[in-house]
Amino acid sequence: MKGQVVRIIAGFYDVVDPKNRKLYPLLRGSGLLRLNETSPIVGDFVDFEEKGFIKKIYERKNQLIRPKVANIDQALVFISIREPNFSSLLLDKFLLVIEAKNIPVILLVTKIDLDSNFENLLLDYQKMNYNIFFINNKKNEIPVELKAELEKKLNFVIGQTGVGKTSFINNFLDKKFAIQEISQTLNRGKHTTRVVQIIEKENFRIIDSPGFSSFSYSEISKNEIRNAFKIFKKFSSDCKFRSCFHFQEKTDQCGIKRALKDGKIPENRYKNYLYFLGKYEKKNY
Protein backbone atom coordinates (compact mmCIF):
# COMPACT_ATOMS: atom_id res chain seq x y z
CA MET A 1 0.00 0.00 0.00
CA LYS A 2 1.11 3.57 -0.69
CA GLY A 3 0.49 6.44 1.70
CA GLN A 4 1.87 9.69 3.11
CA VAL A 5 3.46 10.15 6.54
CA VAL A 6 1.40 12.69 8.50
CA ARG A 7 2.95 12.47 11.98
CA ILE A 8 5.91 10.92 13.79
CA ILE A 9 6.02 10.30 17.54
CA ALA A 10 8.69 8.29 19.36
CA GLY A 11 9.66 6.25 16.32
CA PHE A 12 6.09 5.47 15.30
CA TYR A 13 4.66 6.72 12.01
CA ASP A 14 1.08 7.67 11.21
CA VAL A 15 0.32 7.18 7.51
CA VAL A 16 -2.72 8.29 5.49
CA ASP A 17 -3.93 6.59 2.32
CA PRO A 18 -4.28 9.49 -0.19
CA LYS A 19 -7.13 7.74 -2.01
CA ASN A 20 -9.61 7.29 0.85
CA ARG A 21 -7.90 9.43 3.58
CA LYS A 22 -7.90 6.43 5.95
CA LEU A 23 -5.41 6.75 8.81
CA TYR A 24 -2.99 3.91 9.63
CA PRO A 25 -1.37 4.66 13.01
CA LEU A 26 1.61 3.22 14.88
CA LEU A 27 3.71 1.91 11.99
CA ARG A 28 7.46 1.30 12.29
CA GLY A 29 10.29 1.58 9.78
CA SER A 30 11.44 -1.75 8.35
CA GLY A 31 14.73 -3.36 9.29
CA LEU A 32 16.09 -2.59 5.82
CA LEU A 33 15.42 1.13 6.24
CA ARG A 34 17.12 1.09 9.64
CA LEU A 35 20.04 -0.85 8.17
CA ASN A 36 20.45 1.86 5.53
CA GLU A 37 20.05 4.53 8.23
CA THR A 38 17.05 5.91 6.36
CA SER A 39 14.04 7.28 8.21
CA PRO A 40 10.75 8.66 6.87
CA ILE A 41 9.87 12.27 7.65
CA VAL A 42 6.52 14.06 7.64
CA GLY A 43 5.31 14.47 4.07
CA ASP A 44 7.09 11.39 2.72
CA PHE A 45 5.24 9.07 0.38
CA VAL A 46 5.90 5.48 1.44
CA ASP A 47 4.99 1.86 0.78
CA PHE A 48 3.68 0.18 3.93
CA GLU A 49 1.96 -2.88 5.35
CA GLU A 50 -1.45 -2.25 6.91
CA LYS A 51 -0.47 -3.54 10.36
CA GLY A 52 3.27 -3.62 10.13
CA PHE A 53 6.19 -1.74 8.69
CA ILE A 54 7.06 1.02 6.26
CA LYS A 55 9.05 -0.70 3.53
CA LYS A 56 10.00 2.04 1.06
CA ILE A 57 10.40 5.82 0.91
CA TYR A 58 9.70 7.44 -2.46
CA GLU A 59 11.93 10.16 -3.89
CA ARG A 60 11.21 13.60 -2.41
CA LYS A 61 10.46 16.58 -4.64
CA ASN A 62 11.80 18.88 -1.91
CA GLN A 63 12.87 18.70 1.72
CA LEU A 64 13.60 20.92 4.71
CA ILE A 65 15.97 19.72 7.43
CA ARG A 66 14.76 21.85 10.34
CA PRO A 67 11.92 21.17 10.69
CA LYS A 68 12.06 17.81 8.89
CA VAL A 69 9.33 17.93 6.24
CA ALA A 70 9.12 16.85 2.60
CA ASN A 71 7.03 17.19 -0.55
CA ILE A 72 5.73 20.68 0.24
CA ASP A 73 3.46 22.19 -2.41
CA GLN A 74 3.71 25.74 -1.10
CA ALA A 75 4.78 27.69 1.98
CA LEU A 76 2.59 30.09 3.94
CA VAL A 77 4.92 32.66 5.49
CA PHE A 78 3.29 34.61 8.32
CA ILE A 79 4.61 38.05 9.19
CA SER A 80 2.94 40.60 11.46
CA ILE A 81 2.86 44.38 11.15
CA ARG A 82 2.98 44.93 14.91
CA GLU A 83 3.36 42.84 18.07
CA PRO A 84 5.90 41.60 16.98
CA ASN A 85 6.95 44.41 14.66
CA PHE A 86 7.53 43.81 10.96
CA SER A 87 11.10 42.79 10.07
CA SER A 88 12.21 42.46 6.45
CA LEU A 89 15.36 40.68 7.66
CA LEU A 90 13.34 37.96 9.37
CA LEU A 91 10.98 37.66 6.41
CA ASP A 92 13.91 37.35 4.01
CA LYS A 93 15.44 34.66 6.24
CA PHE A 94 12.33 32.55 5.70
CA LEU A 95 12.24 33.33 1.98
CA LEU A 96 15.94 32.55 1.56
CA VAL A 97 15.46 28.92 2.62
CA ILE A 98 12.09 28.36 0.98
CA GLU A 99 13.03 29.85 -2.38
CA ALA A 100 16.34 27.96 -2.38
CA LYS A 101 14.20 24.81 -2.41
CA ASN A 102 12.04 26.19 -5.26
CA ILE A 103 8.92 26.08 -3.08
CA PRO A 104 6.15 28.55 -4.08
CA VAL A 105 5.40 31.18 -1.41
CA ILE A 106 2.33 33.01 -0.13
CA LEU A 107 2.88 35.87 2.32
CA LEU A 108 0.21 36.27 5.00
CA VAL A 109 0.53 39.67 6.67
CA THR A 110 -1.31 39.79 9.99
CA LYS A 111 -2.41 42.43 12.51
CA ILE A 112 -2.94 45.08 9.86
CA ASP A 113 -5.53 46.65 12.16
CA LEU A 114 -2.66 47.82 14.39
CA ASP A 115 -0.99 50.09 11.78
CA SER A 116 -2.67 52.00 8.95
CA ASN A 117 0.70 52.15 7.16
CA PHE A 118 0.80 48.38 6.65
CA GLU A 119 0.77 48.40 2.83
CA ASN A 120 3.81 50.67 2.59
CA LEU A 121 5.84 48.20 4.66
CA LEU A 122 5.25 45.54 2.02
CA LEU A 123 5.74 47.71 -1.08
CA ASP A 124 9.09 46.11 -1.95
CA TYR A 125 7.55 42.64 -1.84
CA GLN A 126 4.61 43.74 -3.97
CA LYS A 127 7.07 45.11 -6.53
CA MET A 128 8.85 41.73 -6.52
CA ASN A 129 5.50 40.11 -7.36
CA TYR A 130 5.03 38.09 -4.19
CA ASN A 131 1.57 36.68 -3.63
CA ILE A 132 0.42 38.65 -0.56
CA PHE A 133 -2.73 38.49 1.56
CA PHE A 134 -3.44 41.01 4.33
CA ILE A 135 -5.22 39.59 7.38
CA ASN A 136 -7.25 41.68 9.84
CA ASN A 137 -7.18 39.67 13.07
CA LYS A 138 -10.20 41.48 14.50
CA LYS A 139 -12.49 40.44 11.65
CA ASN A 140 -11.42 36.78 11.82
CA GLU A 141 -12.18 36.34 8.13
CA ILE A 142 -10.24 34.36 5.53
CA PRO A 143 -10.42 35.69 1.95
CA VAL A 144 -12.13 33.41 -0.55
CA GLU A 145 -9.20 33.94 -2.93
CA LEU A 146 -6.81 32.60 -0.29
CA LYS A 147 -8.90 29.47 0.25
CA ALA A 148 -8.74 28.81 -3.48
CA GLU A 149 -4.93 29.11 -3.39
CA LEU A 150 -4.63 26.55 -0.57
CA GLU A 151 -7.06 23.92 -1.80
CA LYS A 152 -5.70 20.47 -2.73
CA LYS A 153 -2.14 21.43 -1.76
CA LEU A 154 0.17 20.55 1.10
CA ASN A 155 0.80 23.92 2.76
CA PHE A 156 3.77 24.44 5.08
CA VAL A 157 3.16 27.11 7.75
CA ILE A 158 6.06 29.16 9.10
CA GLY A 159 6.29 32.40 11.05
CA GLN A 160 7.51 34.07 14.20
CA THR A 161 5.81 33.27 17.50
CA GLY A 162 2.83 35.54 18.10
CA VAL A 163 2.05 36.45 14.49
CA GLY A 164 -1.24 34.54 14.40
CA LYS A 165 -0.40 31.14 12.91
CA THR A 166 -2.38 29.21 15.51
CA SER A 167 -5.42 31.45 15.20
CA PHE A 168 -5.32 31.04 11.44
CA ILE A 169 -5.14 27.24 11.65
CA ASN A 170 -7.92 27.12 14.25
CA ASN A 171 -10.11 29.33 12.10
CA PHE A 172 -9.26 27.79 8.75
CA LEU A 173 -9.27 24.08 9.55
CA ASP A 174 -11.53 24.07 12.60
CA LYS A 175 -8.50 22.61 14.33
CA LYS A 176 -10.18 21.57 17.56
CA PHE A 177 -12.50 19.29 15.65
CA ALA A 178 -9.74 17.81 13.50
CA ILE A 179 -7.37 17.15 16.38
CA GLN A 180 -10.07 15.72 18.61
CA GLU A 181 -10.84 13.22 15.87
CA ILE A 182 -7.20 12.19 15.55
CA SER A 183 -6.69 12.01 19.30
CA GLN A 184 -9.65 9.68 19.74
CA THR A 185 -8.34 7.42 17.01
CA LEU A 186 -4.81 7.24 18.36
CA ASN A 187 -5.66 7.60 22.05
CA ARG A 188 -2.91 10.15 22.50
CA GLY A 189 -4.60 12.99 24.30
CA LYS A 190 -4.63 16.63 23.30
CA HIS A 191 -2.60 18.07 20.47
CA THR A 192 0.55 20.09 21.16
CA THR A 193 2.85 21.76 18.66
CA ARG A 194 5.89 19.85 19.88
CA VAL A 195 5.78 17.64 16.80
CA VAL A 196 5.55 18.33 13.09
CA GLN A 197 2.33 16.97 11.63
CA ILE A 198 -0.10 17.30 8.76
CA ILE A 199 -3.56 18.50 9.77
CA GLU A 200 -6.33 18.24 7.24
CA LYS A 201 -9.98 18.98 6.67
CA GLU A 202 -11.77 18.23 3.41
CA ASN A 203 -9.51 19.44 0.57
CA PHE A 204 -7.18 21.50 2.78
CA ARG A 205 -3.93 20.23 4.32
CA ILE A 206 -1.51 22.19 6.47
CA ILE A 207 1.83 21.20 8.00
CA ASP A 208 1.80 22.40 11.60
CA SER A 209 5.28 22.71 13.11
CA PRO A 210 6.69 23.60 16.57
CA GLY A 211 7.63 27.15 15.65
CA PHE A 212 10.15 29.28 13.86
CA SER A 213 12.95 28.81 16.42
CA SER A 214 13.82 25.46 14.83
CA PHE A 215 13.68 26.84 11.29
CA SER A 216 17.23 26.79 10.00
CA TYR A 217 19.09 27.93 6.92
CA SER A 218 22.31 26.20 7.97
CA GLU A 219 21.60 23.50 5.37
CA ILE A 220 22.02 25.98 2.52
CA SER A 221 25.41 26.10 0.83
CA LYS A 222 27.19 29.30 -0.09
CA ASN A 223 26.40 28.67 -3.76
CA GLU A 224 22.70 28.33 -2.92
CA ILE A 225 22.68 31.59 -0.94
CA ARG A 226 23.91 33.69 -3.86
CA ASN A 227 20.99 32.64 -6.07
CA ALA A 228 18.43 31.54 -3.47
CA PHE A 229 16.03 34.44 -3.84
CA LYS A 230 13.68 34.07 -6.78
CA ILE A 231 14.45 37.55 -8.05
CA PHE A 232 18.21 36.86 -7.86
CA LYS A 233 17.77 33.76 -10.02
CA LYS A 234 16.10 35.97 -12.61
CA PHE A 235 18.97 38.45 -12.95
CA SER A 236 22.03 36.34 -12.04
CA SER A 237 21.97 34.84 -15.53
CA ASP A 238 23.26 38.24 -16.69
CA CYS A 239 26.39 37.97 -14.51
CA LYS A 240 29.63 37.72 -16.49
CA PHE A 241 31.00 34.95 -14.26
CA ARG A 242 29.06 31.90 -13.08
CA SER A 243 30.87 32.16 -9.73
CA CYS A 244 29.59 35.71 -9.14
CA PHE A 245 28.52 36.43 -5.55
CA HIS A 246 27.15 39.91 -6.36
CA PHE A 247 29.38 41.55 -3.76
CA GLN A 248 32.92 42.48 -4.79
CA GLU A 249 32.32 42.24 -8.53
CA LYS A 250 32.06 45.38 -10.64
CA THR A 251 28.58 46.56 -11.56
CA ASP A 252 29.11 46.00 -15.29
CA GLN A 253 30.04 42.36 -14.54
CA CYS A 254 27.15 41.57 -12.18
CA GLY A 255 23.53 41.18 -13.27
CA ILE A 256 22.30 41.62 -9.69
CA LYS A 257 24.15 44.90 -9.19
CA ARG A 258 22.86 46.23 -12.51
CA ALA A 259 19.31 45.26 -11.57
CA LEU A 260 19.82 46.98 -8.21
CA LYS A 261 21.08 50.14 -9.91
CA ASP A 262 18.10 50.12 -12.29
CA GLY A 263 15.64 49.75 -9.40
CA LYS A 264 14.57 46.23 -10.38
CA ILE A 265 15.80 44.78 -7.07
CA PRO A 266 14.91 46.68 -3.86
CA GLU A 267 17.90 48.03 -1.96
CA ASN A 268 16.69 46.46 1.29
CA ARG A 269 16.58 43.00 -0.31
CA TYR A 270 20.18 43.40 -1.45
CA LYS A 271 21.29 44.60 2.02
CA ASN A 272 19.64 41.57 3.61
CA TYR A 273 21.40 39.33 1.11
CA LEU A 274 24.77 40.81 2.12
CA TYR A 275 23.86 40.21 5.77
CA PHE A 276 23.19 36.52 5.12
CA LEU A 277 26.34 36.20 3.04
CA GLY A 278 28.36 37.78 5.86
CA LYS A 279 26.82 35.39 8.37
CA TYR A 280 27.90 32.50 6.19
CA GLU A 281 31.46 33.81 5.98
CA LYS A 282 31.60 34.05 9.78
CA LYS A 283 30.04 30.56 10.07
CA ASN A 284 27.49 32.00 12.46
CA TYR A 285 24.39 30.31 11.09
Curated annotation (Swiss-Prot):
UniProt keyword annotation of Plastid present: no
Keyword field contains Oxidoreductase: no
InterPro entries named in the record: G_CP_dom, NA-bd_OB-fold, P-loop_NTPase, Ribosome_biogen_GTPase_RsgA, RsgA_GTPase_dom, RsgA_N
GO cellular component terms given for this protein: cytoplasm
Positions with a binding annotation for Zn(2+): 239, 244, 246, 254
Database matches in CDD domains: YjeQ_EngC
Keywords assigned by UniProt, alphabetized: Cytoplasm, GTP-binding, Hydrolase, Metal-binding, Nucleotide-binding, Ribosome biogenesis, RNA-binding, rRNA-binding, Zinc
Localization (cell): Cytoplasm
A single MF term (Gene Ontology): GTPase activity
Cofactor: Zn(2+)
Pfam families assigned: RsgA_GTPase (PF03193), RsgA_N (PF16745)
Main location: cytoplasm
Enzyme class: hydrolase
Domain of life the protein comes from: Bacteria
E.C. number(s) listed in UniProt: 3.6.1.-
A Gene Ontology BP annotation from the UniProt entry: ribosomal small subunit biogenesis
Domain called CP-type G: residue spans: 61-215
Cofactor: record remark: Binds 1 zinc ion per subunit.
Chain positions recorded as GTP binding sites: 110-113, 159-167
Family membership noted in the UniProt record: Belongs to the TRAFAC class YlqF/YawG GTPase family. RsgA subfamily.
Subunit structure: Monomer. Associates with 30S ribosomal subunit, binds 16S rRNA.
Entry function: One of several proteins that assist in the late maturation steps of the functional core of the 30S ribosomal subunit. Helps release RbfA from mature subunits. May play a role in the assembly of ribosomal proteins into the subunit. Circularly permuted GTPase that catalyzes slow GTP hydrolysis, GTPase activity is stimulated by the 30S ribosomal subunit.
PANTHER family xref list: SMALL RIBOSOMAL SUBUNIT BIOGENESIS GTPASE RSGA, SMALL RIBOSOMAL SUBUNIT BIOGENESIS GTPASE RSGA 1, MITOCHONDRIAL-RELATED
The protein's name in its UniProt record: Small ribosomal subunit biogenesis GTPase RsgA
Organism: Mesomycoplasma hyopneumoniae (strain J / ATCC 25934 / NCTC 10110)
Taxonomic lineage of the native organism: Bacteria, Bacillati, Mycoplasmatota, Mycoplasmoidales, Metamycoplasmataceae
Name of the encoding gene: rsgA
